[in-house]
Amino acid sequence: MLGRPVFGLGKAITSVDVAVIDANSEWIGVKRLQLMENAGRSVAEEAAKLAKPGSRVVVFAGPGGNGGDGLVAARHLAYMGYQVTVVMIVKPEEIRSPETRAMYEALAAMDLTVDIRIARAPADVAPVEADVVIDALLGTGLRGAPRPPYSDAIEAVNSSTGLKLAVDVPSGLNSDTGETPGAYVKADITVTFHKPKPGLLRRPDVAGRLVVVSIGAPPEAEVYVGPGDVAYRVRPRSWKAHKGSSGRVLIVGGSQDYVGAPILAALAAERSGVDLVFLAAPEHVTRAASHHPTIIPVPLRGSPNIHPDHVKKLEQLLDRVDAIAIGMGVGLSDETKEAIPQIIVKALEKEKPVVVDADGIKILGERGIPNSNRKLVVTPHQREFQILFGDALSGVDEDIKARALKAAEKAQRHGLVILLKGPIDIVTDGERIRLNRTGVPAMSVGGTGDTLAGITAALLARKLEPFHAASIAAFVNGLAGALAYAEKKDSMTAMDLIEKIPEALNNPIEAANRVPAYQRLVRGRIEWQPPVGRSES
């Protein structure tokens, strides 16, 4: 067993997680300026524990958000009675963060209590004599070795007298990996925000004593999927992109009785930013899709249903794609029940992530769940969950915590990702649990589950981790549905939802701010255990 799952992004958070939480906090209503104020005040309070009022504190500040945190700390320390000097390593007009600029302007007015030095040349960045030196040069966004003037400032911090306090992460340390490819601050204490960062835990020799503090980011900014997840995890195409480099998806579905489901999944995948979408289905299904010329048909001949004789053809096609969605409208004929597990296993053997939906879930419930090392994503609703795992859930109006923990237990046991659909979607890989609250009641129309499967497969093909792909797909599918509902009301269809996927995916923050406010649906509460406190090196 891997231990008790946590609600949110894990016990430690990456640099991308930090950006996601900041953006989601702002969406909820806690602005970045407020987060910066809280962060800087927390730094000041920790610095005040290291030296008595009247002592000298020097803050080395950069132009980004980390520097802004340091400027806030300087303001609070001046109020507490410390002799405060701020060394700005760039000119004020070069401050790139609007929040940091606002904090600098406030500090610039404090001409009686704060000494500000602008480093206009490398010679202006020199070691200082102080009781506490605060490193607010570079934060979690660092990639590669610091360059001048940052590297010069880092050397100045290390050569200064006094205790070294790093803001969020020591400058020069990669907060995700713990690597130090160039100059880095060797801190005595690091005050990090919200949760520990992996690099800090790996390099106590650089971070020193670790203190985790709250900056007022709501737990919901991490537990609920939000527009920040889309904005910071789904990357736009590179200018160096070529056909296929942004992902290729295979949709396998359809049967004698169901034609539309795999077509909807294919159209949703196409609108989710992949380059190529293949639709493998019985011949009458691919004929029905022929008026969508951008979908590549792969007719499965010889049977009106997916048949074991089709497996070899599909196995060859797997080498040409990056992800697969299977199960939409396949039916439950005996030949299909035999073929579907074979196709899934072949895909997993080739290290292709697989999304299983609808009838595919029912077939796995009967035939068994293959081992996938978390490359398998299943998207059941409540009844399908019971069929797949043989264990009933409490009703959708019951305790969200109980439902989530049961789903996490199944995900952990079987080594897969579960996207449990409902008024509040639950996404879990057995270690982490996230919730999604986008969507509208009108999404009860047929086909919205098929669109969800297609979006998930597309995000997997775009190289997102399965847990994040499923989480973001739930958010985008629900947001697109809400956007469609805003125009069509109860007349909306799954096709209307598909047309809104680009807006939800490409402008998530703006789009999320235009849909009706969330209505509280959750029954019960989750456990949130803040990691605030000290971790000795």
Swiss-Prot record:
E.C. number(s) listed in UniProt: 4.2.1.136, 5.1.99.6
Reactions performed catalytically: (6S)-NADHX + ADP = AMP + phosphate + NADH + H(+); (6S)-NADPHX + ADP = AMP + phosphate + NADPH + H(+); (6R)-NADHX = (6S)-NADHX; (6R)-NADPHX = (6S)-NADPHX
Biological process annotations from GO: metabolite repair; nicotinamide nucleotide metabolic process
The protein's required cofactors: K(+)
Domain YjeF N-terminal: start-end pairs: 13-223
InterPro entries listed in its UniProt record: CARKD, Nnr, Ribokinase-like, YjeF_N_dom, YjeF_N_dom_sf
UniProt entry keywords in alphabetical sequence: ATP-binding, Isomerase, Lyase, Metal-binding, Multifunctional enzyme, NAD, NADP, Nucleotide-binding, Potassium
Pfam families, alphabetized: Carb_kinase, YjeF_N
Region of interest (NAD(P)H-hydrate epimerase), residue spans: 1-227
Region (NADPHX 1): 65-69, 139-145
Annotated ADP binding sites: 421-425, 440-449
HAMAP family linked: NADHX_dehydratase, NADHX_epimerase
Protein name as catalogued: Bifunctional NAD(P)H-hydrate repair enzyme Nnr
Lineage: Archaea, Thermoproteota, Thermoprotei, Desulfurococcales, Pyrodictiaceae
Gene: nnr
